[in-house]
Design a protein with these regions (language model features):
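Polytopic transmembrane helical bundles with strong interfacial aromatic enrichment
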Residues: 1-164
Length: 164
């Protein structure tokens, strides 16, 4: 029996793969900062560079693929953009995209050099993180938690399709 896959099924495969690859890596960000702090604040520049890389090269392309394949699935499937589960998931994806582009990426671009300076200023001694750095890093952690919850809600909407 030959392997046959429809364009809709392929789109669904791309959609799910983009979510797993693009956003799965970002869930690991929630443990990067605490692990770095347990080891040494000297690892924090790496944490911010890694988060920047994950957000720019994994999450942003994933958002594009998720949106493109999602719109394709709505147009080819028996769905309407006005369906609650689709509208809510689309709103969540837009919020996550905006958070990523307007908050997370700029925050890591700001925090990485800030903490690099603080590490350099410490020389061989203990690193003392500034109040500004701690405040901004805490804010980023809270925003990351909210984003993670939004992602889980979007996945639930896609799987359960309430109202469909």
């Amino acid at each position: 029996m030959p392997l046959a896959i429809t364009s809709y099924e392929f789109s669904l495969f791309l959609h799910i793969t983009a979510v797993v690859v693009g956003f799965g890596a970002t869930f690991a960000e929630s443990v990067m900062f605490p692990v770095a702090m347990k080891m040494s604040a000297r690892y924090l520049p790496y944490v911010h560079r890694l988060q920047l890389t994950l957000n720019q090269y994994f999450a942003v392309p994933a958002l594009i693929v998720v949106l493109a394949t999602g719109f394709y699935q709505v147009s080819e499937g028996n769905w309407e953009l006005g369906d609650f589960w689709i509208s809510a998931a689309l709103a969540i994806v837009i919020v996550i995209a905006l958070l990523n582009l307007l908050y997370f990426i700029p925050a890591d671009r700001r925090l990485a050099p800030m903490v690099e300076r603080e590490v350099a200023d410490a020389g061989a001694g203990d690193v003392t993180l500034s109040a500004q750095y701690r405040r901004e890093a805490t804010r980023e952690g809270i925003a990351g938690t909210v984003t993670g919850i939004l992602l889980v809600v979007a996945i639930w909407l896609m799987v359960d399709k309430p109202g469909a």
